[in-house]
Amino acid sequence: MMEKKTIDLSKSVFEIASAYPEVKDIMSELGFTEIVKPSMLNTMGKMMTIPKGARVKEIPLSTIIDAFTLSGFEVIN
């Protein structure tokens, strides 16, 4: 059985993207286009959480959670 991939929304975008590189593609498709730039991921990504980014970008958190769930992730916190 495959290990469940878990995204903890209390962690920084940088931590999540480091653990699961495919998260960058999912988030980029949702409108977080800066995430694919290493400089942005290494600076803002270390301070930003997905819920904070969702508020800034005005993307419903439910949309983001649905996209992760469809990609096989479990979302917590």
Stretches found by the model and what they are:
Residues M2-N77:
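Compact, charge-rich alpha-helical regulatory domains located at protein termini
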